[in-house]
Amino acid sequence: TRTHDGRPVRMLAVIDEYTRECLAIRAARTFKSHQVLELLAELFVLKGVPEHIRSDNGPEFTATAVRDWLKNVGAKTLFIEPGSPWENGYAESFNGKFRDELLNREIFYTLKEVQILTEMWRREYNTIRPHSSLGYRPPAPETFMPVVPEVAGLT
Protein backbone atom coordinates (compact mmCIF):
# COMPACT_ATOMS: atom_id res chain seq x y z
CA THR A 1 0.00 0.00 0.00
CA ARG A 2 1.00 3.65 -0.30
CA THR A 3 0.24 6.88 1.44
CA HIS A 4 -1.45 9.72 -0.45
CA ASP A 5 1.94 11.17 -1.42
CA GLY A 6 2.84 7.95 -3.27
CA ARG A 7 5.36 6.71 -0.71
CA PRO A 8 5.23 2.95 -0.11
CA VAL A 9 4.20 1.38 3.18
CA ARG A 10 5.35 -2.14 4.03
CA MET A 11 3.42 -4.42 6.35
CA LEU A 12 4.73 -7.07 8.72
CA ALA A 13 2.05 -9.40 10.06
CA VAL A 14 2.57 -12.21 12.56
CA ILE A 15 -0.19 -14.84 12.60
CA ASP A 16 -0.55 -17.89 14.82
CA GLU A 17 -0.85 -20.88 12.47
CA TYR A 18 -3.03 -22.83 14.88
CA THR A 19 -5.46 -20.24 16.27
CA ARG A 20 -5.32 -17.90 13.24
CA GLU A 21 -4.97 -14.98 15.65
CA CYS A 22 -3.10 -12.03 14.20
CA LEU A 23 -0.58 -11.42 16.97
CA ALA A 24 0.75 -8.19 15.48
CA ILE A 25 0.81 -6.05 12.37
CA ARG A 26 3.43 -3.37 11.92
CA ALA A 27 3.43 -0.71 9.22
CA ALA A 28 6.65 1.05 8.23
CA ARG A 29 8.33 2.52 5.19
CA THR A 30 10.91 -0.30 5.28
CA PHE A 31 11.69 -3.22 7.56
CA LYS A 32 15.17 -4.11 8.69
CA SER A 33 16.09 -7.33 10.45
CA HIS A 34 16.45 -5.54 13.82
CA GLN A 35 12.81 -4.42 13.59
CA VAL A 36 11.71 -8.01 12.97
CA LEU A 37 13.80 -9.13 15.96
CA GLU A 38 12.26 -6.46 18.21
CA LEU A 39 8.74 -7.53 17.29
CA LEU A 40 9.46 -11.25 17.66
CA ALA A 41 11.17 -10.70 21.02
CA GLU A 42 8.15 -8.76 22.25
CA LEU A 43 5.77 -11.51 21.11
CA PHE A 44 7.93 -14.28 22.57
CA VAL A 45 7.85 -12.55 25.97
CA LEU A 46 4.05 -12.27 25.80
CA LYS A 47 3.19 -15.61 24.17
CA GLY A 48 6.23 -17.84 24.64
CA VAL A 49 8.68 -19.13 22.06
CA PRO A 50 6.93 -21.04 19.26
CA GLU A 51 8.18 -24.32 17.86
CA HIS A 52 8.80 -22.64 14.51
CA ILE A 53 8.41 -19.44 12.50
CA ARG A 54 7.17 -19.89 8.93
CA SER A 55 7.84 -17.01 6.56
CA ASP A 56 8.45 -16.05 3.00
CA ASN A 57 11.99 -15.42 1.79
CA GLY A 58 12.03 -11.67 2.34
CA PRO A 59 15.45 -10.27 3.27
CA GLU A 60 14.19 -9.19 6.69
CA PHE A 61 13.52 -12.88 7.51
CA THR A 62 16.46 -14.54 5.77
CA ALA A 63 19.00 -12.22 7.40
CA THR A 64 21.67 -14.10 9.31
CA ALA A 65 20.92 -12.10 12.47
CA VAL A 66 17.27 -13.21 12.45
CA ARG A 67 18.05 -16.86 11.68
CA ASP A 68 20.78 -17.00 14.34
CA TRP A 69 18.58 -15.33 16.98
CA LEU A 70 15.68 -17.70 16.30
CA LYS A 71 18.03 -20.68 16.55
CA ASN A 72 19.43 -19.36 19.86
CA VAL A 73 15.95 -19.01 21.40
CA GLY A 74 14.94 -22.48 20.18
CA ALA A 75 12.56 -21.65 17.33
CA LYS A 76 13.04 -23.36 13.97
CA THR A 77 12.84 -21.35 10.78
CA LEU A 78 10.64 -22.67 7.99
CA PHE A 79 10.79 -20.79 4.70
CA ILE A 80 8.21 -21.39 2.01
CA GLU A 81 9.51 -22.22 -1.44
CA PRO A 82 9.73 -19.13 -3.66
CA GLY A 83 6.63 -18.89 -5.85
CA SER A 84 4.69 -21.31 -3.62
CA PRO A 85 2.18 -19.19 -1.69
CA TRP A 86 -0.01 -22.25 -1.01
CA GLU A 87 2.63 -23.38 1.51
CA ASN A 88 1.32 -20.75 3.89
CA GLY A 89 -2.26 -20.47 2.69
CA TYR A 90 -3.50 -19.13 6.03
CA ALA A 91 -1.14 -16.14 5.65
CA GLU A 92 -2.17 -15.57 2.03
CA SER A 93 -5.82 -15.71 3.07
CA PHE A 94 -5.15 -13.24 5.87
CA ASN A 95 -3.29 -10.87 3.53
CA GLY A 96 -6.17 -10.97 1.03
CA LYS A 97 -8.73 -10.12 3.70
CA PHE A 98 -6.46 -7.38 5.07
CA ARG A 99 -6.15 -5.83 1.60
CA ASP A 100 -9.87 -6.19 0.75
CA GLU A 101 -11.24 -5.04 4.09
CA LEU A 102 -8.84 -2.19 4.86
CA LEU A 103 -5.91 -1.37 2.62
CA ASN A 104 -7.83 -1.13 -0.67
CA ARG A 105 -10.70 0.83 0.91
CA GLU A 106 -8.74 3.70 2.40
CA ILE A 107 -6.69 6.62 1.22
CA PHE A 108 -3.97 6.98 3.83
CA TYR A 109 -2.45 10.41 4.34
CA THR A 110 0.25 9.52 6.85
CA LEU A 111 2.13 6.48 8.09
CA LYS A 112 0.65 7.10 11.54
CA GLU A 113 -2.86 6.87 10.07
CA VAL A 114 -1.95 3.51 8.48
CA GLN A 115 -0.64 2.29 11.84
CA ILE A 116 -3.72 3.35 13.81
CA LEU A 117 -6.29 2.01 11.34
CA THR A 118 -4.33 -1.21 10.94
CA GLU A 119 -4.33 -1.84 14.69
CA MET A 120 -8.07 -1.13 14.86
CA TRP A 121 -8.67 -3.59 12.02
CA ARG A 122 -6.43 -6.22 13.68
CA ARG A 123 -8.40 -6.03 16.92
CA GLU A 124 -11.71 -6.44 15.09
CA TYR A 125 -10.26 -9.30 13.01
CA ASN A 126 -9.22 -11.14 16.18
CA THR A 127 -12.17 -10.45 18.46
CA ILE A 128 -15.29 -9.91 16.34
CA ARG A 129 -14.89 -11.05 12.74
CA PRO A 130 -16.06 -14.65 12.12
CA HIS A 131 -13.56 -17.05 10.52
CA SER A 132 -14.87 -19.93 8.42
CA SER A 133 -11.86 -22.11 9.29
CA LEU A 134 -12.76 -21.73 12.98
CA GLY A 135 -16.45 -22.60 12.66
CA TYR A 136 -17.36 -18.94 12.13
CA ARG A 137 -15.90 -17.86 15.46
CA PRO A 138 -13.23 -15.20 15.93
CA PRO A 139 -9.74 -16.46 16.85
CA ALA A 140 -9.51 -14.45 20.08
CA PRO A 141 -13.00 -13.39 21.17
CA GLU A 142 -13.24 -10.75 23.83
CA THR A 143 -13.83 -12.23 27.24
CA PHE A 144 -17.37 -11.87 28.48
CA MET A 145 -17.56 -11.09 32.18
CA PRO A 146 -21.11 -11.47 33.51
CA VAL A 147 -22.34 -8.98 36.04
CA VAL A 148 -22.95 -10.79 39.31
CA PRO A 149 -25.39 -9.02 41.60
CA GLU A 150 -24.30 -8.58 45.17
CA VAL A 151 -25.61 -11.28 47.43
CA ALA A 152 -27.04 -9.91 50.68
CA GLY A 153 -24.80 -10.47 53.64
CA LEU A 154 -21.70 -11.54 51.65
CA THR A 155 -20.11 -8.14 51.10
Regions found by a protein language model. Give the residues of each.
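Surface-exposed coil/loop segments, especially low-complexity Tyr/Gly/Ser/Thr-rich stretches
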Residues: M11-I15
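Hydrophobic "anchor" residues
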Residues: E21-C22
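Short, basic/aromatic recognition patches
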Residues: T1-R7
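C-terminal domain-tail junction helix/linker
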Residues: V73, K97-T155
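Active-site beta-loop-alpha junctions of metal-dependent nucleic acid enzymes
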Residues: R7-R10, I25-K47, P59
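Short, acidic, Ser/Thr-enriched surface-loop or helix-capping motifs
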Residues: T3, D16-E17
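RNase H-like two-metal-ion nuclease catalytic core shared by retroviral integrases
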Residues: I53-W69, T77-R99, T110-E119, P139-F144
